[in-house]
Amino acid sequence: MDATRAPLAAEPAAAPVSWTHRFEAWTASVCVALLRCLPLDAASALGGFLARLIGPRLRVSDLARRNLRAAFPGLSEPRIDGLVRGMWDNLGRVAAEYPHLRHIRVFDPGSRVETRGTEHLDRALAAGRRVILFGGHLGNWEIAALAAAQYGLDIAQIYRAPNNPLIDRFVARLRGGGSELIPKGTIASRRAVAALRRGGHVSLLADQKLNEGLAVPFFDRPAMTAPALALLASRFDCTVLPARVERLRGARFRLTLYPPLDVPRTGERDADIMAMMTAVNATLEGWIRERPEQWFWVHSRWPD
């Protein structure tokens, strides 16, 4: 069954809150309070330093190294170690930048975010088109959704909620509002459909692992990929815009909107979905190959 036409699901019950969840949330709130005492650039630098120091020693870094070896055959071990350190630097900076997100004004003169390609969005909006923005866990990926909200879009952001419901609510507050947050799960398709029906728009990160979905090439290996983007784009005749965030230096960024991807309409539904998601994965792969140290290599994107 087409996921976007599935029967309406009941709202999931709230996840139970454990003492571990409470401790994690308390720890996060203390860290955020301390980071708020620092200017954004200093907080970002501190987060990067601590993550570079600790991250490469964690067991999960072995997964990052395996993924890098598979994605870039022949890459030397010193180069791989350097990319792992760079990845942790970026992740540490992202974490430390959360307390300051609401103060980043993307489109103000002299902003720390350089923007390119907004004309593609303007053309879609002028034509009355609904828009799906997609990106990946690159640079500080929160910048794209932040920019969309500050641009005045009625946008629903599909995201993977943390396992800790207290952390989920805490991070939602740090994001600063301005967009509807839709956690992935049983009701995500229903809420995304509702957003598009009212004339709104959708943003999502399309690079996460699924246990189900379509096996779509990604770095020359099959990777389970959610077809929701293609289904929604086809059903609502959306303009699909790639939205890339790059970290330039420190806590400065470039947000680039690229020309829209073609939405295949051959009449062969399964083939059209596969073609659309192949184009999405190819776009993400190209960005990652250019700046591999800024991607999230510490998750099992491919089957073992």
Features from the language model and the residues they span:
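Membrane-anchoring hydrophobic helices of lipid-metabolizing enzymes
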Residues: 2-135, 168, 177-179
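Non-catalytic C-terminal accessory region of glycerolipid acyltransferases
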Residues: 2-19, 81, 85, 125, ...
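Soluble or luminal CAZymes and related metallo-dependent hydrolases
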Residues: 26, 60, 113, 184, ...
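Hydrophobic alpha-helical segments typical of transmembrane helices
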Residues: 30, 42, 64-67, 144, ...
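Active-site metal-coordination segments of metallo-dependent hydrolases
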Residues: 62-63, 160-165, 223-226
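Catalytic core of membrane glycerolipid acyltransferases/transacylases, capturing the structured
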Residues: 93, 127-185, 211-216, 247
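A conditional alpha-helix N-cap/helix-loop micro-motif detector
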Residues: 111-114, 164, 182-186, 222, ...
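Short amphipathic alpha-helical segments and helix-helix/interface helices
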Residues: 121-122, 145, 171-172, 192-193, ...
